[in-house]
Amino acid sequence: MEFILGIFCVIFCLRAGAGFGVDPSLQIDIFEDFQLGEATPGVQQVQGFHNRSKAFLFQDTSRSIKASAETAERIFTKLRNKHEFTILVTLKQAMLNSGVILSIHHADHRYLELESSGHRNEVRLHYRSGSHRSQTEVFPYILADDKWHRFSIAISASHLVLHIDCNKIYERIVEKTFMDVPPGTALWVGQRNNVHGYFKGIMQDLQIVVMPQGFISQCPDLNRTCPTCNDFHGLVQKIMELQDILAKTSAKLSRAEQRMNRLDQCYCERSCTVKGNIYRELESWMDGCKKCTCTNGTAQCETLTCSVPNCLSGFAPAYVPGKCCKECQPVCMYQGQMYFEGEQEAVQSSSGACVLFQCKSNTMQRIESPECLPLNCPQSQHITLRSGCCKVCKGHDFCSEGHNCVEYSICKNLNDKAVCICRDGFRALREDSAYCEDIDECTEGRHYCRENTVCVNTPGSFMCVCQTGYLKIDDYSCTEHNECATNQHSCDENAVCYNTVGGHNCVCQPGYTGNGTVCKAFCTDGCRNGGTCIAPNICACPQGFTGPSCEADIDECTEGFVQCDSRANCINLPGWYHCECRDGYHDNGMFSLSGESCEDIDECATGRHSCSNDTVCFNLDGGFDCRCPHGKNCSGDCTHEGKIKHNGQIWVLENDRCSVCSCQVGLVMCRRMVCDCENPTVDLFCCPECDPRLSSQCLHQSGELTYKSGDTWVQNCQQCRCLQGEVDCWPLPCPEIDCEFSVVPESECCPRCISDPCQADIIRNDITKTCVDETNVVRFTGSSWIKHGTECTLCQCKNGHMCCSVDPQCLQEL
């Protein structure tokens, strides 16, 4: 294994160091593919950061810069299923603007979106992860400062690097991206759609480079590592594929060995067993009046067609025991009658005595008659036989003395001999009825089945089977069956059954949808946030939501459903809540739901106080105090961000013009600016609620609601705010958790800790933790396979835990 890893690393290093150029086939020039120019509405070609490419001013909000379906698909073809690419742009964004640089989305799913918020001074990357969940990475940085910046964000599997002006600003481990964009996905530049996310400023060299460390095309002097994270993930994936091949090969070998062992213990040649006899493949034999052949282990028989043999003088056609057709046999002529070899004739002599003759060698020869036994019947019941001198009683059982009746033929006693007759439902294959075959009454029209029935032939008879939807009256008749009345239908409990000729129809009741066999309740407006429609227009809401469509979040904090510890504040979240430590407290690492794990921060010991040098910091529960040593005259000044602020001084934060701070006897107190909407000079950026202009209103993402400037709302696990006509959204803050396995419940936004790794949808993957599968093959974390001996049981290794589940859809397709 170490040797293989070494080989891969050498290959990757050689590839990484082969050169600093960019293969044009791996470079997507967005402006060139969009064919932006002077004729493009809403943009204007202007002077850029350099003169080597075109630069465009994005300012007019009436624009619609969206790729055509053909252009988008051409770009997606290069991006699809790629885990290593870099977004590059040189830009100059207007101050306070919050706008989208590039957006790839389908319906509500953002597969890749880059935006810069001048309201919150941060850059956001939205993407869809391999777990098919929407993810957002937030990077605090002032990009909207009306200055030129060279920006790049490189993604290599789970590794992300952000460069600004050729300086590495952020480097993070993130969830792996999922770029399997479906058909119909939209690609926008400078906006999210026709309503939201308008970028204002100049952009130049907007590109996507599908290669490792694509940032070097913008900053050639940057160092390149060897190998990249995606290379390593690719190596791990190859090893997992080899493991899977090894497991499948081992399983095949095991099955082959088992089959060989079974073959060693059995007779493998195909054969047919008929009436206790074994016949080899293609062997033929006679079975009465049928000629049979063993074909693929099955006896196939056909009735013989007998021809009359042409016999020599002294011979005549006759049946031979064990043979179906007549063969030439010796005969004798006596008194004008023909006798076959072995047949006897009793003749009365002139003296009245019985003389017995037998045909032997073409001559009737006299033979000794056996001694006659006394009869146990009256003389009136005595019968004289032509074939013997001894009389028998009337009703004598000739069949018990032997007969030649074979298949489907039975022996019947007559007065002076035994004969063969066919069983009921069979016909004779020859005139002596020793062999018979079944009569197919159905095909020959000799049945009595009436309408609504189907005739089925059986050995010696037939049966009448009712057609589907009919009920049997007697052996030959069926009548229409009302499945609805007898409750023998297949309709859902929420469907109406309608009887039809030969069957029935199921129709879902009003308020339900389906095929009648399965009907589900229908809610006109749907059930949101994970709700379930349980009856027409009635939703069962999950915990934390209410309303006809489960559209309203229950504020557990204001409703008084929870009681947080005195050291914590209750923070409402969609479908949930958490108790957040108050200022002056921090969590001790136990992360209790009620906030009991909040403990005091010793600002004095940690240096997080604002006391000046002439005062002494004194820690308090949830805060601190600056005290003047006895006998000294202290200034009461404060230390804030490394600078001295005088006692009583008021100032505005450098990075937040909407927050005002003051120094009060060594303590720095900061608060949001008080908004006086009656003041004509009020700062509308800090006080958007004071902006009465219609142009400052915002349209909700659904297009159904309008918000005033300053309004806030939650949409798709993001906190949104309307600011002077622009909608800015950022991820909801989630409480910190410290656990190996977590899950985001349906309709909620924040993860919760769980103990069962198989239920987790968020796992801190550690490839050093492995699983041993059912065939003793070692599996890496993240690998998945079909369990040996099954077709629909999918197993996955999750941080050393093997988790298996059955795929119901797979079972249905079997």
UniProtKB/Swiss-Prot annotation:
Residues listed as glycosylation sites in the UniProt record: 51, 223, 296, 515, 613, 633
Keywords from the named record: Calcium, Disulfide bond, EGF-like domain, Glycoprotein, Metal-binding, Repeat, Secreted, Signal
Gene3D superfamilies: 2.60.120.200, 6.20.200.20, Complement Module, domain 1 (2.10.70.10), Laminin (2.10.25.10)
Keyword Cytoplasm: no
Disulfide bond sites: 399-411, 405-420, 422-436, 442-455, 449-464, 466-478, 484-497, 491-506, 508-519, 523-533, 527-539, 541-550, 557-570, 564-579, 581-598, 604-617, 611-626, 628-634
GO annotation terms (biological process): fertilization
Name by which UniProt lists this protein: Protein kinase C-binding protein NELL2
Lineage: Eukaryota, Metazoa, Chordata, Craniata, Vertebrata
Gene encoding the protein: nell2
